[in-house]
């Protein structure tokens, strides 16, 4: 096992049982897991499932509360869809194509063509009653080809999930919409993940086309690209004016359909400065033309200009988790932690041990019934230090609850809550009358920890599990 200083996100993901380690062996077969899953396709494990489902729930409700329509689209489509969108012409080498009964299909590399079809369907049914801007959100799975040599852990994969949304917006409102998306990104990063968004931690990269390759690698005309890039430059300037976040420009890094703002997190780790790309906001003037949105919107809404904003607040969920695990050294916010409460029964070898065990068991069951992910660990006075070191270096629960003879006698629980901002545990003394009272008081601690999440999505997700075997 790597030391704390040498650990990568792969080590942390394995310790927390978030993912299966590809090079570990499958029992009986004596072959690596990657032999069966394939390179670049992460297999999320028991600790990773709750993270993904909880994150999906928070993000879906957050977006719904902000006027997005939550959708789900198929994983495959006829290549006729991707011919219209331009993916076959400009993105074919990054796609997985296959034949079904003589017809060519593709595993979707992006969600945008499907989202545009949904808009066209709603316009056909409801015409100008449909609101503009029209916003759809999907916690959507996509697949893109990556050379085997570039695949690495969760950071570079072939199959990944995006917190993906598309906004169909009249031309005069593009800059306001782009700025609003940045504010949404800031809310999610700060309230759910405790990541400060400031001039010290973030910068904005305006990724532009290479004008010499327009028509070859980038769709559209030079004039369209220059207009779109200027609109994003103005939106980025507004972000800079309010938050002081620096803007850099990079030629040739745009998407094939339009320029984009990429948000780069800067972190200092072991004296080494690292930059990680997080979310993205992309300006698209090509797909509206290819799907004839200009004609539809002009006819139904009387609007001459319409564009599409592609945006992902976190980007690739897999990549984001990899970066976050490395940055936070395996610590997760309470809402997403695989183990939210670890109940540690510290036995003494005396008659009180039965009371200690009964109380620990009752508290764990009560927390589980309330929807929390819980683990119970039996320990002793002599083995406690070793057990705590093991727990903190592997499972890393969000909250540790210690129950020993003193806690039983004095009716006060010894609770240690991990704080992501200080990266230390803070100690709480939680008084209780009986086990049910202890459960309610611990649930109140959880509600306080989840308060920022509730401000995003209205409520905190509850995905219970008994993970005692992990300790």
Curated annotation (Swiss-Prot):
Transmembrane segments: none annotated. GO terms for biological process: threonyl-tRNA aminoacylation. Gene3D superfamilies: Anticodon-binding domain, Bira Bifunctional Protein, Domain 2. GO terms for cellular component: cytoplasm. SUPFAM superfamilies: Class II aaRS ABD-related (SSF52954), Class II aaRS and biotin synthetases (SSF55681). One of its GO terms (molecular function) is metal ion binding. Its EC number is 6.1.1.3. Binds 1 zinc ion per subunit. It catalyses: tRNA(Thr) + L-threonine + ATP = L-threonyl-tRNA(Thr) + AMP + diphosphate + H(+). It comes from the Archaea. Keywords: Aminoacyl-tRNA synthetase, ATP-binding, Cytoplasm, Ligase, Metal-binding, Nucleotide-binding, Protein biosynthesis, RNA-binding, tRNA-binding, Zinc. Residues 8-333 are annotated as: Catalytic. InterPro entries: aa-tRNA-synt_IIb (IPR002314), aa-tRNA-synth_II (IPR006195), aa-tRNA-synth_II/BPL/LPL (IPR045864), Anticodon-bd (IPR004154), Anticodon-bd_dom_sf (IPR036621), Thr-tRNA-ligase_IIa (IPR002320), ThrRS_core (IPR033728). Zn(2+) binds at residues 112, 166, 310. Homodimer. Probably interacts with its editing subunit. PANTHER family: THREONINE--TRNA LIGASE, CHLOROPLASTIC_MITOCHONDRIAL 2 (PTHR11451:SF44), THREONINE-TRNA LIGASE (PTHR11451). Catalyzes the attachment of threonine to tRNA(Thr) in a two-step reaction: L-threonine is first activated by ATP to form Thr-AMP and then transferred to the acceptor end of tRNA(Thr). This protein is probably not able to deacylate mischarged L-seryl-tRNA(Thr) as it lacks the appropriate domain. Belongs to the class-II aminoacyl-tRNA synthetase family. This is Threonine--tRNA ligase catalytic subunit. It comes from Aeropyrum pernix (strain ATCC 700893 / DSM 11879 / JCM 9820 / NBRC 100138 / K1).
């Amino acid at each position: 096992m790597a030391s704390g200083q040498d650990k990568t996100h792969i080590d942390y993901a394995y310790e927390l049982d978030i993912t299966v380690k590809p090079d570990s062996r499958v029992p009986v077969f004596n072959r690596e897991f990657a032999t069966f899953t394939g390179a670049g396709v992460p297999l999320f494990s028991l600790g990773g499932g709750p993270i993904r489902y909880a994150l999906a729930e928070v993000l879906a409700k957050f977006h719904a509360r902000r006027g997005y329509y939550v959708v789900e689209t198929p994983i495959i489509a006829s290549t006729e869809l991707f011919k219209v969108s331009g993916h076959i012409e400009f993105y074919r080498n990054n796609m997985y194509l296959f034949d079904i009964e003589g017809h060519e299909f593709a595993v979707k590399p992006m969600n945008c063509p499907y989202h545009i079809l949904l808009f066209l369907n709603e316009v056909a049914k409801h015409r100008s009653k449909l609101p503009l801007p029209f916003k759809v959100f999907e916690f959507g799975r996509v697949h893109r080809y990556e050379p085997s040599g570039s695949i690495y852990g969760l950071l570079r994969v072939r199959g990944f999930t995006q917190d993906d949304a598309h906004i169909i917006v009249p031309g005069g409102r593009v800059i306001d919409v782009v700025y609003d998306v940045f504010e949404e990104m800031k809310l999610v990063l700060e309230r759910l993940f405790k990541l400060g968004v400031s001039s010290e931690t973030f910068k904005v990269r305006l990724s532009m086309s290479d004008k010499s390759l327009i028509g070859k690698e980038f769709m559209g005309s030079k004039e369209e690209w220059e207009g779109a890039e200027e609109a994003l430059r103005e939106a980025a300037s507004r972000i800079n004016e309010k938050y002081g976040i620096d803007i850099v420009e990079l030629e040739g890094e745009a998407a094939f359909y339009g320029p984009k703002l990429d948000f780069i997190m800067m972190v200092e780790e072991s004296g080494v400065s690292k930059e990680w790309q997080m979310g993205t906001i992309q300006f698209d003037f090509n797909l509206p033309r290819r799907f004839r949105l200009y004609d539809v919107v002009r006819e139904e809404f009387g609007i001459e200009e319409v564009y599409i904003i592609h945006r992902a607040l976190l980007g690739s969920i897999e990549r984001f988790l990899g970066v976050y695990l490395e940055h936070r050294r395996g610590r997760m916010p309470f809402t997403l932690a695989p183990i939210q409460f670890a109940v540690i029964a510290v036995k003494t070898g005396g008659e009180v041990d039965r009371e200690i065990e009964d109380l620990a068991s009752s508290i764990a069951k009560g927390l589980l019934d309330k929807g929390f992910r819980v683990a119970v660990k039996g320990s002793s006075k002599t083995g406690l230090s070793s057990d705590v070191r093991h727990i903190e270096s592997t499972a890393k629960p969000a909250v540790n609850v210690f129950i020993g003879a003193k806690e039983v006698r004095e009716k006060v629980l010894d609770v240690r809550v991990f704080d992501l901002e200080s990266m230390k545990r803070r100690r709480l003394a939680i008084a209780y009358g009986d086990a049910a009272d202890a459960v309610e008081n611990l649930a109140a601690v959880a509600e306080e920890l989840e308060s920022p999440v509730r401000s995003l999505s209205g409520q905190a997700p509850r995905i219970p599990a008994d993970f005692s075997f992990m300790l």
